[in-house]
Amino acid sequence: MEQYIMKGGNPLVGEVTTSGAKNAALGILAAAIMTDDDVVIDNLPDVSDINALLDAISHLGAKVDRIDRHTVRINAANIHAVTVEDEHMRKIRASYYFIGALLGKYKSAEVPLPGGCTIGSRPIDQHLKGFRALGSDVKIVRGAVVAHAIDLVASHIYLDVVSVGATINIMMAATMAEGETILENVAKEPHVVDVANFLNSMGANIKGAGTDVIRIKGVRRLHGTNYSIIPDQIEAGTFMCAAAITRGDITVKNVIPKHLEAISAKLTEMGCEVVEFDEEIRVVGKPKQRHMNFKTLPYPGFPTDMQPQMTVALALADGTSVVTESIFENRFKYVDELSRMGANIKVEGSVAIVDGVGSFTGAQVVAPDLRAGAALVLAGLAADGYTTVDEIGYVERGYENFEEKLRSLGAVIERVDSEKEAQKFRLRVG
């Protein structure tokens, strides 16, 4: 019974430092097995998804050395298998990156179908389309993707839908294909660019990452590198929303402001004060915040991973807001939980109508996925009384030391694993 318990009502105030980007790290770690040389990766977030992926890399036969909590050295010279069997991988969406990495380097891969948060069907058909276009035979066999190729040959590939995962996966495989691959209608998210930059630091020839068209000239081999992962855009945005939700004053450090422009713009539209510095952003929530509308879109649009957090902020704003989710079809599952705290939200298909209320009341809620779990925690910190959030394993997949960082901002929150500990918390806090 691991859960967060908190007593809300305190504005969050202070400074918090963003960890490395989990979504970039997942792709970069998979790509690290594409060379026989040492690869040193810094600014790695210490979260459960990353640790599970490192375990899987080790099980393939690579040597994995944790230099410190946020730095790892990987040497894949002695990889002895192209089959990912680790059961933990079935719980991680990004396990599919092993397909592109193994196929690119060894021309063969067998990887369990991905798991992760249940926020939509999220098919991998675009990944498979890309691998087949590069000359690989791809089948789904007993719950796993099985891919084999005699040689990978460059191709001109147009993605039918913009997909971050497919963009990264095909890009990795094409890195060691013969000739120049052209990828069109690709994702432009910061972590796509970061994975491309990492591959280039190992000797890949990738141009255009961050634009609509990526060109990849295949190379015969990749070499070792030292690389530092970019800051986490979504973690930074979560703490920015925390300032709005709790009417606080938070400076988020170790950020790239350009990656946060859509979030900053919407918080400003709500009436928050947003001040950008070179590597910091300060957000000051206001007693009265305005309603506004937003729609999730691929980058540089508003990120779907920030939709629950921003919706919580709007649920406490004046007036009626409209939230349109255009990326995943099941991303409003947290609304029923938020309603237990007093939110007034009606969901009609891919649209949520949010009527702002003056305050939330503490309740026992359950996190349905990673980002919704974080949003429910922030709602609890703004609520009157005590809130417990169950299924926090989702949250810990993507946020490093979440409750510790919140406590540093003045939150009254603890992670407990029994009702007895929860009761002690209530008695101590009063």
Predicted features and spans:
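Short, structured segments at the rim of ligand-binding sites
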Residues: 1-430
